[in-house]
C-alpha cells in the first residue's frame, strides 16, 4: 500500500472545513474528519477505485458530506491536492495539479 500524502493547501482545506462544521454543531467537525479518514483509507487500499476527472486527477466523494478528495497517484505515493465542496469552481483545485 502506498502512503497518502496531503499537500499543505489540501490540509488547509480540511482544517477550514473541520472548523466550519464544528461551529455549526458540536461534534460535526469530528464526523467530517471520520468521513475523510474513511475515504483516505479507501484511496490507500485501492487508488484506482475512483474515476479520473482531470489530467490524471481522481476524485473520491465523502459519505454524508458534499466534499470530494482530489488526488493523484504516483509510483511511490498518493498525493492529495484538494478537499473541496462539490459545487466549488473546479479551476480552484485544477490549479493545484
List PLM regions with ranges.
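Short, hydrophobic secondary-structure boundary micro-motifs
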Residues: 30, 51-53, 91-93
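Basic/aromatic recognition patch in beta-strand/loop cores that engages polyanionic ligands
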Residues: 38, 45-77
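Enriched for short, Lys/Arg-rich terminal
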Residues: 68, 72-97
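Arg/Lys-rich, positively charged N-terminal/basic patches that mediate binding to nucleic acids
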Residues: 1-33
